[in-house]
């Protein structure tokens, strides 16, 4: 197992493909472990010509706890630590949901390490966009469980509320949720990640100053972070390109993988 050290925090990471190829760093959303980026999905990026890095954010999976009161900048610096450990100078940074916020912060705070930004199903932090439905917000704020059966049911409830309509395989999701629980169950860490996201507030003015090739992707069926969050992100980042994916909710089941990989490959080729 590979770990990168960032002061007192140890970050678990995995790689796919040839390190000589352009590196694509995949950053997870709230509470998600690196295995949420399924291995087959990572291999599709490898086939598209990328060296892929996935890692557990601090406070989840096999990475260590973060100190109280950490920020999105601290979480972005964990990605830098992984790149340092691999001796990689620059990377294309792909983040979903909270991972998109971390990726945006990476581009803002570490521009010399950011080859390009891909912000997926995320938002700027402005309170007037990217808002959840009442049902999604209530479920998001439901505390996690240290009981395996309840943790699995909570995962399935999330899929039913904000997953992509017509693309939810409950049997597969139940199996995956069990694998996630068995790998690491750390609901308290999820709460600290959520606090970091809330403390950051609006990134709009900082995003306006970015000088990095940017692709913003959002599904039109997202009930957790409304598509207005993605639209605003693309509006404020200079020369950003926006891709709306029809039928995609606040997840990326394998039905959408080819579309996502193709979009990222085209984005890279146009830089």
Which stretches of residues belong to each language-model region?
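Flexible "cap/lid" loop of the alpha/beta hydrolase fold
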Residues: 117-146
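Active-site nucleophile elbow and catalytic-triad environment of alpha/beta-hydrolase enzymes
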Residues: 190-206
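Conserved HGGG/HGGXW glycine-rich cap/lid loop of the alpha/beta-hydrolase fold
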Residues: 7-65
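Active-site loop/oxyanion-hole signature of alpha/beta-hydrolase fold enzymes
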Residues: 60-94
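Catalytic active-site module of serine/aspartate enzymes centered on a nucleophile-bearing elbow/loop
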Residues: 240-271
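Conserved alpha/beta-hydrolase catalytic His-Asp/Glu region
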Residues: 151-192
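Acidic catalytic loop of the alpha/beta-hydrolase fold
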Residues: 221-225
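Short beta-strand/loop motif that positions the catalytic acidic residue
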Residues: 210, 216-218
């Amino acid at each position: 197992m590979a770990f990168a050290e960032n002061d007192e925090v140890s970050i678990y990471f995995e790689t796919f493909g040839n390190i000589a190829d352009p590196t694509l760093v995949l950053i997870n959303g709230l509470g998600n472990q690196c295995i949420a980026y399924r291995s087959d999905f990572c291999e599709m990026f490898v086939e598209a010509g990328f060296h892929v890095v996935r890692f557990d954010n601090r406070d989840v999976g096999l990475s260590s706890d973060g100190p109280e009161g950490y920020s999105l900048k601290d979480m972005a610096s964990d990605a830098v630590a992984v790149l340092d450990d691999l001796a990689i100078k620059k990377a294309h940074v792909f983040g979903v949901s909270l991972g998109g916020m971390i990726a945006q912060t990476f581009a803002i705070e570490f521009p010399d390490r950011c080859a390009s930004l891909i912000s997926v199903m995320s938002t700027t932090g402005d309170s007037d966009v990217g808002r959840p439905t009442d049902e999604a917000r209530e479920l998001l704020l439901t505390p996690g469980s240290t009981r395996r059966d309840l943790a699995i049911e909570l995962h399935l409830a999330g899929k039913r509320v904000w997953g992509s309509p017509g693309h939810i395989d409950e049997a597969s999701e139940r199996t995956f949720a069990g694998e996630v629980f068995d790998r690491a169950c750390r609901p308290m860490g999820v709460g600290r990640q959520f606090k970091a996201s809330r403390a950051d507030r609006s990134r709009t003015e900082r995003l306006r100053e970015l000088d990095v090739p940017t692709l913003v992707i959002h599904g039109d069926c997202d009930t957790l972070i409304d598509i207005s969050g993605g639209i605003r992100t693309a509006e404020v980042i200079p020369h950003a390109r926006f891709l709306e994916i029809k039928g995609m909710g606040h997840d990326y089941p394998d039905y959408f993988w080819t579309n996502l990989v193709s979009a990222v490959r085209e984005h890279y080729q146009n830089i």
